[in-house]
């Protein structure tokens, strides 16, 4: 996914309108944003000698809603989804040691949190370097969820929390 696919919606019902209405309407995203950010690229590059064993492809797999009803603000139906992207298309904040491996917009219903399982696979020259599955990932509409840590070199238990509205500071749970 990319920022070009960002979208906003709102449904307003007007009853018994006898003149031109004048009102302010605040649009909201129908998406949760899922970011997967690694912090171990510098370690990999420093410890891999002349052959750099950093991934050249990332895939992220999860099940996601495929339908969004603007009137009810509900996301429904679902399908398995796998994104295949080149890693490091952006850095996070001003800290260059953090690399965004994937950013996905996922349809979400209003006023509820969806819990997902997300699988990350890092590849180099079509060979799998590392696969990690993250369970119980909370996704909420108009919130950003960051999975952040040494995701390419370690496995373990990850704690992930969501952050309200994308304009506020990120809610990063760092896992080493």
Whereabouts are the PLM-identified features?
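Short, low-hydrophobicity acidic/polar segments
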Residues: 1-35, 39-42
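Intrinsic disorder/low-complexity signal
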Residues: 1-5, 14, 103, 113, ...
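Generic recognition of cysteine residues
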Residues: 11, 143-144
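Hydrophobic residues positioned within well-ordered beta-strands of beta-sheet architectures
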Residues: 23, 34, 118-120, 147
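A mature extracytoplasmic/lumenal domain signature
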Residues: 38-42, 124, 151
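Tryptophan-paired
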Residues: 43-143, 168-176
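Intrinsically disordered, low-complexity repeat and linker tracts
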Residues: 146, 150-176
